[in-house]
Amino acid sequence: MTSTIDKNGAAESRVFEADVAKLLQMMVHSVYSDKDVFLRELISNAADACERLRYEAISDPALLTDETRPRISITIDAERRQLAVEDNGIGMGRDELVDALGTIARSGTKAFIEQAEAAESGDGVALIGQFGVGFYSAFMVADQVDVVSRRAGAREAWRWSSDGKGTFTVTPVDESEAPARGTRVTLHLTEDATGYTDRLKIEQMIKEQSGHVPVPIALIEKPGAEPAEIADGAALWTRPRGEISASEYADFYRSVAGQFDEPALTVHFRAEGRQEFTALLFVPQTRPFDLFEPDKKRQLKLYVRRVFITEDADLLPRYLRFVRGVVDSADLPLNISREMIQESPILAAIKKSITGRILSELEKLADKDAQAYGKIWEAFGPMFKEGIYDAADRRDTVLGLSRFRTTAGSLRSLKDYVGALKENQTSIYYLAGQDAARLEASPHLEGFRARGVEVLLLSDPVDSFWVTSGPSFEGKPFKSVTQGAADLAAIPRLDAGTEPSPDVSEGVTEFLAFLKTTLSDLVSDVRSSDRLTDSPVCLVAAESGPDRQLEKILLGVGQLAGASKPVLEVNPNHPLVASLAALGQDDREFKEDAARMLLDDARVLDGDRPSDALEFSRRLIRLVERGLRRSSAGGGD
């Protein structure tokens, strides 16, 4: 962003950064059908400004001057084709105007642009609130936006102005032109947006979109007219549940969460006893874009007796960070600092209570409506499973609520899994990796499928970590199918009544011993496999170390000095193994090539590359040529 800066109070002209300019052009030339969203976004910003003033006034009451009651007013000027949204909140100084409205120094801008360009028009408007760029939605209906603001406690007032075409100006304004405190946003409406000067339309929009913000909203039909209160600022969460309709809950959810969907789950309760507080919590239907950003602020707003304190309090564990809403405490002191909040035993007790309540309500939904719960899981399952790793005190509950894709189907619970255990099965088997389709085709599953043993298919990054935390479910430990012995001998095969597999020939037994000796520098062991039925070989990890997927992750982030030697398991009844053993009986060079080819084949089946792709190709050609010569000479089987 470039600028012409005058510290003596003259006009200052600036150029938007490229991403912001592009964003503005998207708004100016918007084809979105639902442009009403702009008013909700401006009212939401105004309400936030009022709440921040109330918080700062706790330590500095002089900021309130003579005007202590927060308010938002919306003025219609049909003659001038203008609409103004004014609040008496915290206000902004010169630098704050530039920082808040001239730049968007956050990753959300670029992500918004990328997704909005790809979205259909109906979906694109929903991205406005989702990505936190709501102020700029004003340019969907205005060809110029003026923002006049005076910060609480300051004499100077400033005007920010832009036509959305790449530049903006910041100029000082006379005190008489500015609010005594707070911000006024004036939209110069485009010709096709004159409908937003209709009183009934604006009144309906306020009631539908913003009727439950905790600040009174008044509508002024024309300049100089008496304000008419449209919303009284009564906090929705203070009302009894029986008096609140589903649509009121949905409107409040969209306001507090910045979402455009319906809540998938609403939890509203009042706690009394050692701690007294009210919580109104929502689980969204769709995943906000920034849930995995490590520096993202938490999304529960903390109030103390209806005074907004912070939206960065540690009110829920990280694995529930998708929950939105408000918590209003009657016990915390109003003058508590944001730093002291995190150390408050009262807050710790509130966190424990609402965490338990959310989990309890999710359990009820899972039992009552598996399909609705399944949609929540599809959206938030990857982060919810972090609780298996992080929340030792609630691990059993989180495990019970978790759903998994398995070899038996999608969204299976562990209760379903344990209920389908096979005879003599003592473990919950899983296979972890990065690609669900590759997991489904893994040779490690063959022996389990042959016995009808269900295997969890884990493809989320967190999966490789929570399974190492030693969890069990209903007394059954989790065991990777790529680690240690499969222990399948005690579980009968589905085709147990058919003719048994032939005994391993002496030649194959000798060939396996040769593999073990030849590959001793590369593998820790070579052994006959009971997990393979269709594939010739596979790699597994030693019993005591990390499984194959976790080792790859740890190597990738530099947490391991080097890879451990895997175990090479060989299917002694596979035709390829038998043929290689027979063809190499009197040819050591052939057997050495065969040994290394089988190891590279196992690496490929495990999702890796051969150790040396060129040598792998040459070795394969040599084996085929020798095999063909021996077969044509009558030396093969």
Swiss-Prot record:
SUPFAM superfamilies assigned to the protein according to its UniProt record, in alphabetical order: ATPase domain of HSP90 chaperone/DNA topoisomerase II/histidine kinase, HSP90 C-terminal domain, Ribosomal protein S5 domain 2-like
Keyword Nucleotide-binding: yes
Pfam families in alphabetical order: HATPase_c_3, HSP90
Principal subcellular localisation of the protein: cytoplasm
Subcellular location: Cytoplasm
Protein purpose: Molecular chaperone. Has ATPase activity.
Assembly and binders: Homodimer.
UniProt-recorded name of the protein: Chaperone protein HtpG
Species of origin: Nitrobacter winogradskyi (strain ATCC 25391 / DSM 10237 / CIP 104748 / NCIMB 11846 / Nb-255)
